Amino acid sequence: MSSSRPVFRSRWLPYLLVAPQLIITVIFFIWPAGEALWYSLQSVDPFGFSSRFVGLDNFVALFHDSYYIDSFWTTIKFSTFVTVSGLLVSLFFAALVEYIVRGSRFYQTLMLLPYAVAPAVAAVLWIFLFNPGRGLITHFLAEFGYDWNHAQNSGQAMFLVVFASVWKQISYNFLFFYAALQSIPRSLIEAAAIDGAGPIRRFFKIALPLIAPVSFFLLVVNLVYAFFDTFPVIDAATSGGPVQATTTLIYKIYREGFTGLDLASSAAQSVVLMFLVIVLTVMQFRYVESKVRYQ
């Protein structure tokens, strides 16, 4: 019986092939994480020339800071809205395009367009449309007696950044959902239709369970996206306002580290955010993946 394990002529070749990825991981992930952990235990001057070990004082100060607690819950709320809304909307459009016979190529291309737009550009686009004075959407809302001004209304500001973030990510989610739906054997759908199952029942009883692995993958990806990659959207759309209503943890880290020059507090917040993402990811793999059936 032959073994399928690859055999290399040189014992060093496998390590050589893995080395580039290991170097990138060390330089861009492990090293910065170690630096953040070290600075989080220090009291650092604004220019980083001198430091003094203070232990966990920076973390204690964080959790006694009401603004930090507010940004923590804002992050949880924002990430939940972006992740859940993004997945549901993308799945809806993927299922819709799946059942469109004529012109499906046009709709596929249309759904992929947001992916080509930079996050900051996406934010500026929706700022123009939601501009309180000249925006097309705000003019339409005013016709129905609804006053829109996201610069003064915290709820409207949160809606704007969530909406822009979901719109930016919808193409990525759509692509995976649509490919997953296309991979479902037609015989299963046709057999269910012969048995009298309608389109909605076929989707929830056959299609949705079969695309569960893709859904779980996108759940993890969208959670990371909501925590980190939405920074340009928030920065361009609201700058964390009004009154820090849209200041997420990642934006607060930037503001304290690069604007306030409080390197120690910024590092401590980075460590807390890192552990928060790790805990949420482990929980997803522990409790959500256990319900996913892989083929």
Curated annotation (Swiss-Prot):
PROSITE patterns: ABC_TM1. Belongs to the binding-protein-dependent transport system permease family. UgpAE subfamily. The complex is composed of two ATP-binding proteins (UgpC), two transmembrane proteins (UgpA and UgpE) and a solute-binding protein (UgpB). Keywords: Cell inner membrane, Cell membrane, Membrane, Transmembrane, Transmembrane helix, Transport. Part of the ABC transporter complex UgpBAEC involved in sn-glycerol-3-phosphate (G3P) import. Probably responsible for the translocation of the substrate across the membrane. Residues 33-80, 131-156, 229-262 are periplasmic. It comes from Escherichia coli O157:H7. Pfam families: BPD_transp_1 (PF00528). Its main location: membrane. InterPro entries: MetI-like, MetI-like_sf, UgpAE/MalFG_permease. The chain crosses the membrane at residues 12-32, 81-101, 110-130, 157-177, 208-228, 263-283. The keyword Zinc-finger does not apply. It is found in: Cell inner membrane. The lineage of its organism: Bacteria, Pseudomonadati, Pseudomonadota, Gammaproteobacteria, Enterobacterales. Residues 1-11, 102-109, 178-207, 284-295 are cytoplasmic. GO terms for biological process: transmembrane transport. GO terms for cellular component: plasma membrane. Residues 76-284 form the ABC transmembrane type-1 domain. It comes from the Bacteria. This is sn-glycerol-3-phosphate transport system permease protein UgpA. It is a multi-pass membrane protein.
